[in-house]
Amino acid sequence: MSNQDRGGPSSDLTRITDVETGLFDATFFAVTLDKRVATARRGLRPLALALLEPVTEVASDQPSPAIDREVASSVVETLRDSDIACRLTGDRVAVILEDTPENGAVWTIERVRRRLAESPRPVTLRAGVACY
């Protein structure tokens, strides 16, 4: 019997993970962001939040699952272990970067953008960064 069958740790992880991308979900993001901001405030440490959204050539209300997976993969491969990526609504991804000032956050997101631009199916990325 696996941990998932017993309601063990992997079962808990699936409750907070987006099935399509493997990123944490919006609920996990909301709780985690509050905690990380409080920690940054207490320790007077920098914290950055980046919001990412792929830009598609075709106007559509429906996000593309393949593009969403490509964005998620590029984000995860670029981030440090301490950083957190979460899928919000549709094709939007939020990234929490602890101990990261504005220039570090911009540099990190630029690395994600370049990785996506050089992928077999290039993706254009719209991004914004906010810092504490």
PLM region descriptions:
Residues S2-P9, A50, D81-I84:
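Short low-complexity stretches enriched in small and charged residues
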Residues T39, E77-I84, R113-P122:
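Short catalytic/binding micro-motifs of nucleotide second-messenger systems
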Residues N3, G8, R45, Q62-S64, ...:
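Intrinsic-disorder/low-complexity coil detector
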Residues L97-E102, L116-A117:
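Hydrophobic, well-ordered secondary-structure segments
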Residues L44-P46, S82, T124:
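A structure-centric signal for secondary-structure junctions around beta-strands
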